[in-house]
Amino acid sequence: MKLLKDLLVDRKEFEDWKNNLTWARDGTLYLTTFPDISIGQPKYAKDINCNSKNLFHVKEFPLEFENKLDFELAQQNGLLNSQPVCYPRVCKPSPIDDWMAVLSNNGNVSVFKDNKMLTNLDSKGNLSSRTYHCFEWNPIESSIVVGNEDGELQFFSIRKNSENTPEFYFESSIRLSDAGSKDWVTHIVWYEDVLVAALSNNSVFSMTVSASSHQPVSRMIQNASRRKITDLKIVDYKVVLTCPGYVHKIDLKNYSISSLKTGSLENFHIIPLNHEKESTILLMSNKTSYKVLLEDELHVTADNIIAPYLEKKFKKWSTIWNEFNNYETTLVIHGISLSPDGYSIAIVYDMERVAFKYKIASEQSFNIMFAPLYHTWTISERAVGLAWYQTYQIYNQSLPKLPENFSMNKKLLNGNYPISLDFQSYLNALMKSEEMRIIMFLNMTIDKPSILSFLEALYEYAINKKSELTNSFDLACVLSIAAILKREAPIYNGTLLMKNSFLEETFNLESFTADPETVTSTTNNTWKRCGVTLLPILTTHVKICPVSKQRVIDIKRDDLNDYGWFTRGLLERFNEISVYCGTTLEVM
């Protein structure tokens, strides 16, 4: 496939970490540039001209950190005494929520929503137990685990208060190293209900973490070693780790170990190929890459997925900047991240001469390459909104695999609506359905986005609860939906009084059945409709969908109108996410 033109990151500087790039579920790229994080904010364009700059807008994303150890004097880790300024080492967005956790250089793990800090994780204990060097999100529930300098895993759970704000609290801890040992926890990976951690003495532990296991029991699956672990992943219940000269596989079913000599002392990145029929990974370093099949024994083949693209880019660069081969040149990889759905890969790299040269940040320029890992792709629940659109463009605008005879008017959940649920749970069930995910994606590829299937599901719920529809805003909404679907409406009589900061307008309920795009008041003024509730938009407090351009009333700022349970529920559920395509709504 033809690749998109690389995304450029100019006038920035990376620290010497290998986890400098993360791809979030909404399509945002997080880059741990110094001193402030940079992001590749996803954006929508109908025609991107095969250029990734039309999919991402690179900008600085400054965060304010707290240092809980600011006035502590470290006895064992003297580096903490000499690093008063906080800067990011690792960024990881939550796989199920819109939060991001950041590990700083001085042992803090902070959680942010947008650029607002929610918490700086902390627990009781001595300094070493409160100093963190790695963390991982729970892939299933809202919780997070951190590893400290005492060889201990600390689990923090999350609950939401009455204002729907998350509160993080220390729940439990598991000690991996022996008492009195000073081995740090350096790696944590969490796959479904399996958690694997490695210590600074290169021993590896595994445990099963689930709702039923209140106190997980750890098991050592690799003894301490003098070879430093450089990367650690879980692939199909197999632990894969790399160290200088070797790659090891530990089967979690029988704890058998297979090893393979790589023939290179390079630090390898492990790239799981989760959508292959057999357990397969790519091993990638600055100089070489391999494809490894994780059977009983490890089988190595040439990398025919990423290597050809990188070799082509390296030859092109050498033709321009090292035409006569006067210099030794190398490709330096600063970070690798799978797309949230696992179908694509992003690699941040640069080409450089092997020579002593002083560079300042304003001279730096890095490239981010996007490449497909397979020939086809499907719409995944692990991604949302523009992340699907990015995969679509990376695969040269090839459509994903769709169910047979699928249409935009297909009933959600095959028409088996869970009417017995409360309204918010019902909306969540609709949005999580496979049909709704496909509709939201297809809305990004057509000229006139449609949510008729979603309106059909809303109508069925409203008719089932019609005895509870007494509010005029709710009645107007249901009347509008019935008119669009050409279905029977519960009531036609009555009026609706709607307000904004400057005026009031009265509407006959009958007027909501005339035009699906606009509503005319009794004073003969015509108003555009809200994209979710189909109510007239009088207020300036609205948000807009970047794809469909539909406007939605911002319920958090519009406090003048007495919305009912139906319309208020819709506006609260879709206050941040577009029902048309799953993208983040933009504030106007």
From Swiss-Prot:
Signal peptide: none annotated. One of its GO terms (cellular component) is transcription factor TFIIIC complex. One of its GO terms (molecular function) is DNA binding. It is found in: Nucleus. Residues 399-588 are annotated as: Sufficient for SPT15-binding. The record marks Y358 as: Involved in the interaction with TFC6. Pfam families: zf-TFIIIC (PF12660). TFIIIC mediates tRNA and 5S RNA gene activation by binding to intragenic promoter elements. Upstream of the transcription start site, TFIIIC assembles the initiation complex TFIIIB-TFIIIC-tDNA, which is sufficient for RNA polymerase III recruitment and function. Part of the tauB domain of TFIIIC that binds boxB DNA promoter sites of tRNA and similar genes. Plays a role in TFIIB assembly through its interaction with SPT15/TBP. Essential for cell viability. Present with 2070 molecules/cell in log phase SD medium. Heterodimer with TFC6. Component of the TFIIIC complex composed of TFC1, TFC3, TFC4, TFC6, TFC7 and TFC8. The subunits are organized in two globular domains, tauA and tauB, connected by a proteolysis-sensitive and flexible linker. Interacts with SPT15 and directly with TFC6. This is Transcription factor tau 60 kDa subunit. It comes from Saccharomyces cerevisiae (strain ATCC 204508 / S288c) (Baker's yeast).
